[in-house]
């Protein structure tokens, strides 16, 4: 800015000197030389005006580009939310590990039902979920092979010793097969996997919980609506080794997720049911996320009502409201 002011001052000084000289020529009657100086001044003035106009145009273009970049960044956050929801966030990292399911920390998780003796109804809940691609296209179908790990914990942080009340571990292997259906482009993929889930407690105090499933799921995307149905088959166990023989009665054989994905927010509804008219059991979960500061960190609200939020409580009805961020 100082350079521009100095340049303009110099131009004004030069123009004033030239103008004074032209006036002197006029007084002497030499109009030809006076007109030549006037022409030079006019050309200098027009070049400065053109330069100023170009500068203003350049600034306007930069401003417009800045606005466009900001809009594109906002759109990128929307695509990031969708990729994270589908488990397709392949951000570069040396180990090739990326996010799988939602990763969140909810420091305020309140249960409207008892969590057992000596347990506080208020606790924290968090989930870590990652995956790694092993290889791809072995069958020539553009399929991808993954291993994944998800850990969900319920943490009694408001108690004196802050013990972990329950932790569920879910290692799995799955294959993603892209679907290229000309008339059904909203079908994105077909996923087939095997999933183990346990709470790692062994047999002490009859609190051990575990089961194994084979599942198939798909993702159906229409505009900003995402529908993800999943069906599973429980791999049978010996009655003597089965920690939770009635788990299918409470968890059923399927769940569905229906989500709306906005530019800076999402709403998701999860439904699960055993489809029994007599002694019906199931669960509903509502998730709401909002990117408050437009930086990819979402404020997150979660409501759960039903059975099977955790393995230790799979046969207990719980209603819980939790909030935090993801």
Which stretches of residues belong to each language-model region?
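N-terminal regions that are enriched for targeting/export leaders
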Residues: 52-112
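Cleavable N-terminal export/targeting peptides
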Residues: 1-79
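Gly/Thr-rich phosphate-binding loop signature of adenosyl cofactor/nucleotide-binding cores
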Residues: 126
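Glycine/small-residue-rich hydrophobic helix-like segments
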Residues: 266-292, 297
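Outer-membrane pore/translocation modules
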Residues: 25, 96-121, 135-263, 271-273, ...
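Outer-membrane beta-barrel "beta-signal"
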Residues: 317-326
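Conserved, mostly hydrophobic/aromatic
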Residues: 130, 301
């Amino acid at each position: 800015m100082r350079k521009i002011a100095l340049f303009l001052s110099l131009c004004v000084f030069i123009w004033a000197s030239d103008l004074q000289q032209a006036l002197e020529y006029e007084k002497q009657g030499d109009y030809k030389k006076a007109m030549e100086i006037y022409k030079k001044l006019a050309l200098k003035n027009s070049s400065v005006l053109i330069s100023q106009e170009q500068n203003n145009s350049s600034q306007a273009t930069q401003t417009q580009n800045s606005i466009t970049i900001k809009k594109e960044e906002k759109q990128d956050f929307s695509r990031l939310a969708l990729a994270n929801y589908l488990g397709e966030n392949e951000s570069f990292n040396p180990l090739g590990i990326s996010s799988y399911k939602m990763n969140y920390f909810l420091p305020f998780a309140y249960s409207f039902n008892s969590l057992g003796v000596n347990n506080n109804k208020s606790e924290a809940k968090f989930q870590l979920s990652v995956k790694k691609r092993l290889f791809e296209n072995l069958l020539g179908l553009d399929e991808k092979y993954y291993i994944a790990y998800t850990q969900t914990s319920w943490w009694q942080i408001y108690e004196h010793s802050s013990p972990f009340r329950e932790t569920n571990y879910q290692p799995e292997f799955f294959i993603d097969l892209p679907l290229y259906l000309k008339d059904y482009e909203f079908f994105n993929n077909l996923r087939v996997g095997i999933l183990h889930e346990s709470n790692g407690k062994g047999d002490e105090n009859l609190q051990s919980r575990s089961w194994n499933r084979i599942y198939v799921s798909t993702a159906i995307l229409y505009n900003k609506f995402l529908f993800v149905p999943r069906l599973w088959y429980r791999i049978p166990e010996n009655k003597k080794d089965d920690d939770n023989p009635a788990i299918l009665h409470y968890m059923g054989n399927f769940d569905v997720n229906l989500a709306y994905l906005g530019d800076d927010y999402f709403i998701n509804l999860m439904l699960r049911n055993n489809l029994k008219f007599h002694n019906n059991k199931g669960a509903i979960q509502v998730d709401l996320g909002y990117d408050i500061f437009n930086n990819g960190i979402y404020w997150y609200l979660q409501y759960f009502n039903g059975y099977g939020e955790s393995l230790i409580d799979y046969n207990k009805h719980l209603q819980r409201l939790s909030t935090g961020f993801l």
